[in-house]
């Protein structure tokens, strides 16, 4: 088996008496979707923030592509290929679809926002941006204001922005949030197609999507991973059913 693309070992993070991460270890392997599930307040978003570099763990390590990145910040990790999408959209709603992707391409090259206007005319950056939009199926919406996109299209746009970083792994924090059944089904198909681009660590409450997509699932409860396994393993695990899935998880 090849080495993990992303390897988290024994992460601890506390806020006062609250242990948000209590010895968390997990990995993400090439070509897979590894889902992270758990009840509200389990520490999922805190864990993603530590992996992305927005929070520094109290102890433990984050290795990415064989490199210890525990002490690196968000920007450096992104440039190495950690592509994050957000639970709450970080897109610039008044900008066009293309402009949002150009901003991502600028950041990927370490160029500052003040260079945005000349970047709009940069043929190389525009090619990168249009290629990313084509990959997510938004090329025909390039000139549209981002605020006019549907919720699902905004999620696709977030992925396009992440693609400009040439990601080695995607960190996705509740991409299905706010979607109806139809939108969730469409986005599930889209995410399934992304695994050939880069593996995905997927934080998600939509269990239909998780069970359809995940190669492996880790269950986080009160800052601890209580189980990791295949969909079948997790569905049948008594501790997981008691802590999170309930009886519907066996249906």
Regions found by a protein language model. Give the residues of each.
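Glycine-rich phosphate-binding loops of nucleotide-dependent enzymes
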Residues: 2-251
């Amino acid at each position: 088996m090849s080495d993990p693309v992303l390897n988290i070992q024994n992460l601890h993070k506390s806020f006062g008496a609250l242990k948000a991460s209590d010895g968390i270890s997990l990995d993400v392997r090439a070509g897979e979707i590894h889902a992270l599930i758990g009840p509200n307040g389990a520490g999922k978003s805190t864990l993603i923030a530590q992996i992305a570099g927005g929070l520094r763990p109290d102890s433990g390590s984050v290795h990415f592509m064989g490199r210890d990145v525990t002490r690196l910040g968000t920007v450096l990790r992104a440039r190495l290929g950690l592509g994050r999408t957000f639970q709450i959209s970080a897109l610039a709603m008044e900008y066009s679809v293309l402009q949002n992707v150009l901003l991502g391409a600028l950041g990927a090259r370490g160029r500052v926002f003040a260079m945005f206007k000349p970047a709009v005319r940069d043929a190389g950056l525009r090619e990168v941006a249009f290629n990313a939009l084509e990959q997510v199926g938004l090329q025909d919406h390039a000139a549209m204001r981002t605020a006019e996109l549907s919720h699902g299209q905004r999620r696709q746009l977030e992925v396009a922005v992440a693609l400009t970083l040439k990601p080695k792994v995607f960190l996705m924090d509740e991409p299905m949030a706010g979607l109806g059944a139809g939108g969730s089904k469409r986005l599930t198909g889209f995410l399934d197609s992304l695994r050939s681009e880069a593996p995905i660590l997927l934080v998600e409450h939509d269990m239909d999507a998780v069970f359809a997509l995940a190669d492996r699932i880790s269950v986080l409860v009160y800052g601890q991973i209580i189980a990791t396994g295949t969909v079948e393993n997790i569905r049948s695990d008594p501790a997981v059913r008691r802590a999170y899935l309930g009886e519907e998880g066996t249906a």
